Curated annotation (Swiss-Prot):
EC number, UniProt record: 6.3.1.2
Start and end residues of each GS beta-grasp domain: 19-99
Domain GS catalytic: 106-356
Phylogenetic classification of the source organism: Eukaryota, Viridiplantae, Streptophyta, Embryophyta, Tracheophyta
UniProt-listed Pfam families: Gln-synt_C, Gln-synt_N
Native source organism of the sequence: Vitis vinifera
PANTHER family linked: GLUTAMINE SYNTHETASE, GLUTAMINE SYNTHETASE CYTOSOLIC ISOZYME 1-1
Molecular function via GO: ATP binding; glutamine synthetase activity
Identification of the protein by name: Glutamine synthetase cytosolic isozyme 2
Length: 356
């Protein structure tokens, strides 16, 4: 095993200029991540200078067997925390050979929204709080829980420490450092209310980069849990009963909101989000109705309400934002399995481009 570890950690730059590029894309479920690697002749820093590639879409549920080729378009580059050196991770989106985005390519439409002049002028900032649950591989039950049983009630686990309260911290810290190494603007981590559940935050990130960074952060997490022999779940309500669900609260601001007088802009934006509540809920993740019950720090899925410092609201405004008269707000509706390309671009579209 020591030899295997030595080989995995070989520093290729000592002997060659060639690098390994791991191409990442979203699979047919819209939530599963896939990747494969290729050798390049030397370091690359501009994704548009990377070659396009293809894969068998019939094996990912994205193309029929008789016409199975799907084309990968490189869109964002990150340093590879697994191979290190000059090796890279490449976030791609997916197209037909004719150049049309396939149905699971949500990045394409998001990029169009974020390139709109009105949206560009507002410099949209996002901070996404990604919650997830770590499961025992053999039984798909949260780590730290007795198999077939339950731990003590919620209360001591949120930001808790100790072997009886925090389960999987080595995975969480490994992920934190790996994301920083990769160049992802990960801003923090914490243990969540349900034992075995954790959160990391990505942001502030501008426009389309929020989606790129969150997807690659998810990819890195899945790779680390693969090594650890643990399963990561993004199910919005992995355990039924008196246990918190898992969300992806999305913090948002525009230049107008961050400037003096921005609180009035925030209130107008929230009003527009309320008018499109059903459309947003439909796009905010599968199974969200199991999470948005009006309990466990959520608003009921059929009700739109906002408030200052209210974690039972659809939209929460922070005390500092109210006091300073400018800042940001938090959309608490997105589920943990949401597509960040969809959520971030839809918030921008509804608050900037959409006219009631």
């Amino acid at each position: 095993m020591a030899l295997l570890s030595d080989l995995i950690n070989l520093n290729l730059s000592d002997v060659t200029e060639k690098i390994i590029a791991e191409y990442i894309w979203i699979g047919g479920s819209g939530m599963d991540l896939r990747s494969k690697a290729r050798t390049l002749s030397g370091p690359v820093s501009d994704p548009h200078k990377l070659p396009k590639w293809n894969y068998d879409g019939s094996s990912t549920g994205q193309a029929p067997g008789e016409d199975s080729e799907v084309i990968l378009y490189p869109q964002a580059i990150f340093k590879d925390p697994f191979r290190r050196g000059n090796n890279i991770l490449v976030m791609c989106d997916t197209y037909t050979p004719a150049g049309e985005p396939i149905p699971t390519n949500k990045r394409h439409n998001a990029a169009k929204i974020f390139s709109h002049p009105e949206v560009l002028a507002e410099e949209t900032w996002y901070g996404i709080e990604q919650e997830y649950t770590l499961l025992q591989n053999s039984v798909k039950w949260p780590i730290g829980w007795p198999v077939g049983g339950y731990p003590g009630p919620q209360g001591p686990y949120y930001c808790g420490i100790g072997a009886d309260k925090a389960f999987g911290r080595d995975i969480v810290d490994s992920h934190y450092k790996a994301c920083l190494y990769a160049g992802i603007n990960i801003s923090g981590i914490n243990g969540e209310v349900m034992p075995g559940q954790w959160e990391f935050q990505v942001g502030p990130a501008v426009g389309i980069s929020a989606g790129d960074e969150l997807w690659v952060a998810r990819y890195i997490l899945e790779r680390i849990t693969e090594i650890a022999g643990v399963v990561v779940s993004f199910d919005p309500k992995p355990i039924q009963g008196d246990w918190n669900g898992a969300g992806a609260h999305t913090n948002y601001s525009t230049k107008s909101m961050r400037n003096d007088g921005g609180y009035e802009i925030i209130k107008k934006a929230i009003e527009k989000l309320g008018l499109r509540h059903k459309e947003h809920i439909a796009a905010y993740g599968e199974g969200n109705e199991r999470r948005l019950t009006g309990r466990h720090e959520t608003a009921d899925i059929n009700t739109f309400l906002w408030g200052v410092a209210n974690r039972g609201a659809s939209i929460r405004v922070g005390r500092d934002t109210e006091k300073e008269g400018k800042g940001y707000f938090e959309d608490r509706r997105p589920a943990s399995n949401m597509d960040p390309y969809v959520v971030t671009s839809m918030i921008a579209e509804s608050t900037i481009l959409w006219k009631p």
